[in-house]
């Protein structure tokens, strides 16, 4: 079985007494499966995890955010088995706040905010 490593980053976005979560599409085209979670996504080549977290929150929610701390507040590590491949994934989450109102429509993968 082949093995690879994957890295992602996301945001735990606080606004007043609320925490921002998104409902993601899951599965094949036309599937009605979904799940709620923090906005997150893959790091692009040469991108720092903190930069990826800010970018992903914006892409998935349309909100401009800033970090409350340069260090992640949580790290998640897990293994995904997909066909004949094992993916060892690490995700860093950063605490953030909204700095400007809704700027754009969320990505197509997002069903609800």
Q: Language model features by range: what are they?
A:
Residues 1-38:
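N-terminal strand-loop-strand
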Residues 11, 40, 53, 57, ...:
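Residue-level detection of beta-strand scaffold positions
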Residues 13, 86-88, 106:
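Extracellular/periplasmic catalytic domains that process cell-envelope and extracellular macromolecules
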Residues 14-19, 27, 44-45, 73-78, ...:
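Short, charged/polar surface micro-motifs in flexible loops or helix N-caps
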Residues 28-35, 91, 95-113:
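Nudix hydrolase/Nudix homology domain
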Residues 38-73:
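The catalytic Nudix box helix
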Residues 62-101:
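Active-site segment of metal-dependent pyrophosphate-handling enzymes
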